[in-house]
Amino acid sequence: MSDINATRLPVFSLPVFFPFVSDDIQAVLTRGESLC
C-alpha cells in the first residue's frame, strides 16, 4: 500500500502545487518589474 500511495501522491499533488508556484512566479515578476 505504501508504494501505491507513493506513486499516487505526486500525481495528485502536482496539479494542486503548480498553480501556487505559477502565482508565486507571477508575483515575483510583477515585483521585479515594479522595482525596475
Swiss-Prot record:
There is a cross-link at V11-P19 (Cyclopeptide (Val-Pro)). Keywords: Toxin. Amanexitides have a structure closely related to antamanide, a cyclic decapeptide with antidote activity against amatoxins and phallotoxins, and might therefore exhibit the same activity. GO terms for molecular function: toxin activity. Expressed in basidiocarps. Signal peptide: none annotated. Processed by the macrocyclase-peptidase enzyme POPB to yield a toxic cyclic nonapeptide. POPB first removes 10 residues from the N-terminus. Conformational trapping of the remaining peptide forces the enzyme to release this intermediate rather than proceed to macrocyclization. The enzyme rebinds the remaining peptide in a different conformation and catalyzes macrocyclization of the N-terminal 9 residues. InterPro entries: Amanitin/phalloidin. It comes from the Eukaryota. Residues 1-10, 20-36 form a propeptide. Cyclic nonapeptide that belongs to the MSDIN-like toxin family responsible for a large number of food poisoning cases and deaths. Belongs to the MSDIN fungal toxin family. This is Amanexitide proprotein 2. It comes from Amanita exitialis (Guangzhou destroying angel). The lineage of its organism: Eukaryota, Fungi, Dikarya, Basidiomycota, Agaricomycotina.
